[in-house]
Structure formats: structure tokens, C-alpha cells
Amino acid sequence: MARKPLIAGNWKMNLNHLEAIALVQKIAFSLPAKYFDKVDVTVIPPFTDIRSVQTLVEGDKLLLTYGAQDVSAHDSGAYTGEISGSMLAKLGCTFVVVGHSERRTLHCEDNDTVLAKTKAALKNGITPIVCIGEGLDVREAGEHVSYNVEQLRGSLAGLSGEDIAKVVIAYEPVWAIGTGRVASAANAQEVCAAIRATLGELASQDVASGVRVLYGGSVNAKNVGEIVGQTDVDGALVGGASLKADEFATLSAIAAGGPLP
């Protein structure tokens, strides 16, 4: 099954709403409509920017989409500081990142929490980008494949094949995030192939063949082509490079198969 590449730009805690508007405008200007037949492009801004991005995307009928960096496991209630899936859906979010390594590490989110957030996203018609990945100690011990498979199983435990078909998986080796280090294309393929095989076990081969698996970890215009060219890598979850309109547009164009913008 042909899988359309996805390039997702995770802005993390950067840019105010005015800066967000300027960046989205620059990205859209750099990517003519022809590219969107071959690649899906989404931006993942902070919560405070989403309404401004929504107004711009809908008002100018832009072809790129947008999403959120996190979602509450709860529908509503006394959960100070949390944002529900229904709120994000009302803002038109297509995607939401769940289980990012920074959430798992800094906010102590475990697989059960990631699973609950994944369910919350699906309940509200939002595509969860479920993140998994190993630290350097696991990689050096040669246990990276089994570690990621276990994390994947825990993060999707009990989901139906129908629900699994609606998720995106992002493999983000923690040791390569924001460090400038990057897994080789072969490294990325090894883990992404194991992810797809596990999806086949959790759901079916048909479902697994349709799920997009992204690579995230110091992705840039120089390495994205080789990485997304791997059989089981269907795009990238981009960090720092997504804050630079020209580079993010170039990444997207490369994933689309060119030509460069």
C-alpha cells in the first residue's frame, strides 16, 4: 500500500502567535500547491498559537494542516492547565503529538498515560502522532529494537485494528533529539521495520501496511532524503528545522520527491 509521506514540524515552546502567523505564511509561500499531491505537511505550534494558525489556514485556504503538542486524557473538569481533545477538535486540529520523549521524561508520562491520550485524540477525530524511542544507554546495549517494540505495545495496548489504522507512529531516538546526532538511515529503517511488524501483530498486515511511521531526531535538509527513502520510513517529525521556513519547505519538497522550492 502506498503511503503518502508526512512532514510534521514540532515547534515545541517557541514562537508567539504573531511569529507563528509569519512562519506559516512563509512556509505556505515556499510550497506551491503541486507539492501537496505528494506530501502532507503539518505544523505543531504551542497551544497559544493554534487559534491564530487556524484563522490563517482557513482564511487563506492553505493546504498545510496543523495540530497540537499534547492533549489531556480527560474530557473536561478540574484539570488545571490541561487541554481536552474536544477543544483541539473545535480549533480544527488534524494531528496531536502524544508521548513525545520530552513529555515522557520531564512530565513522567508512561505508556498508560500515552495510551489514554491516544484514545482521547481518536475519540475526538484527531490523528495521534504516537512517539516512542530509546535513550543512548539502550542503544549502546543493543536493546533498541526490543525497547521500542515494548513501548509501542504499551502505548497502543487494547486498541482495535480500526483505531490503530488511524494513528501515526514517530520513532524518535532520544539520544538524537536536539543533539545534532542523527541515526543513520539504516538505523532508522531497522527500528521502523520492527514497528511495522509489531503493528501487524497488534492489528493486521493490511493495517500495518497503511500506517505512517515517521523518524524524528535532528532531521534536516541534508539527511532527510536518505532517511525518508527507506522502505518503512514515511516522513519525519521535525524539531529545530521546522522553525526555519526555507529549511522546512525544503524538507517537505525532498519528501515529495522534489524539485526543490
Swiss-Prot record:
Q: Sorted alphabetically, which Pfam families does this protein's record hold?
A: TIM (PF00121)
The annotated pathway is: Carbohydrate biosynthesis; gluconeogenesis; Carbohydrate degradation; glycolysis; D-glyceraldehyde 3-phosphate from glycerone phosphate: step 1/1
Q: Which CDD domains match?
A: TIM
Give me the Gene Ontology terms describing cellular component.
cytosol
Family of the protein in this entry: Belongs to the triosephosphate isomerase family.
Task performed by this protein: Involved in the gluconeogenesis. Catalyzes stereospecifically the conversion of dihydroxyacetone phosphate (DHAP) to D-glyceraldehyde-3-phosphate (G3P).
Annotated protein name in UniProt:
Triosephosphate isomerase
Taxonomy-wise, where does this protein's organism fall, top ranks first? Answer: Bacteria, Bacillati, Actinomycetota, Actinomycetes, Mycobacteriales
